[in-house]
């Protein structure tokens, strides 16, 4: 997605050869126009998949997921990382390690919101090692629902997340694929269009 790549190139800050900071438009301050474009692009890529629910993880996945949900006309469910007084019954849970925060979290979704009849699109802001996506996959499978695909805003293709998900049979659609963050520079994967 060219608009996203431009935004990353202009406003993204390379903190190391492993970490890209995009808090000015994605995961702290949110650019709503860009989020709307992201939602439309996910909807376009998954429009034939008869999606019934979108699942994401709090908090940075919520904005792109809601915009995609708006475009597809389906509800969005986000997995909580923190315990909630109201989220107690029929929980679907998974353990997720955060590469950025270097912490492990127990994520949870109420089983009341997912069923075996659902066709789910998983959306997240970043794909690095694939831990968040794998946790969400586990939760969706616990519900008996079908995963139609995984939509990623920014993929760090130099890390193993995509390969791990593809090995599990997942369709992964990333809007911006980063080949490298070496020398303080963002280099995108050159994708061949058919």
Curated annotation (Swiss-Prot):
Protein residues bound to 5-phospho-alpha-D-ribose 1-diphosphate: 128-132
CDD domains, per database record: PRTases_typeI
InterPro entries per record: PRibTrfase_dom, PRTase-like, Pur/Pyrimidine_PRTase, Xanthine_PRibTrfase
Known EC number: 2.4.2.22
Pfam families: Pribosyltran (PF00156)
Major subcellular location class: cytoplasm
Keyword list, A-Z: Cytoplasm, Glycosyltransferase, Purine salvage, Transferase
Protein family according to the UniProt entry: Belongs to the purine/pyrimidine phosphoribosyltransferase family. Xpt subfamily.
Name of the protein this chain belongs to: Xanthine phosphoribosyltransferase
Native organism taxonomy: Bacteria, Bacillati, Bacillota, Bacilli, Bacillales
Gene: xpt
């Amino acid at each position: 997605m060219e608009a996203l790549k431009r935004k990353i190139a202009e406003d993204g800050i390379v903190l190391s050869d492993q970490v890209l900071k995009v808090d000015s438009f994605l995961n702290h301050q949110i650019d709503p126009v860009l989020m709307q474009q992201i939602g439309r692009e996910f909807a376009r890529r998954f429009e034939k998949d008869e999606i019934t629910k979108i699942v994401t993880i709090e908090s940075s996945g919520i904005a792109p997921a809601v915009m995609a949900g708006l475009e597809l006309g389906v509800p969005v469910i986000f997995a909580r990382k923190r315990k909630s007084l109201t989220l107690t019954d029929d929980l679907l849970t998974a353990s997720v390690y955060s590469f950025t925060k270097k912490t492990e979290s127990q994520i949870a979704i109420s089983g009341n919101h997912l069923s075996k009849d659902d066709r789910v699109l998983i959306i997240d802001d970043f794909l690095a090692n694939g831990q968040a996506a794998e946790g969400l996959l586990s939760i969706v499978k616990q519900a008996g629902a079908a995963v139609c695909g995984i939509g990623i805003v920014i993929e760090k293709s130099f890390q193993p997340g995509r390969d791990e998900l593809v090995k599990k049979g997942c369709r992964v659609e990333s809007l911006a694929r980063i080949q490298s963050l070496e020398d303080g520079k963002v280099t995108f994967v050159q994708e061949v269009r058919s």
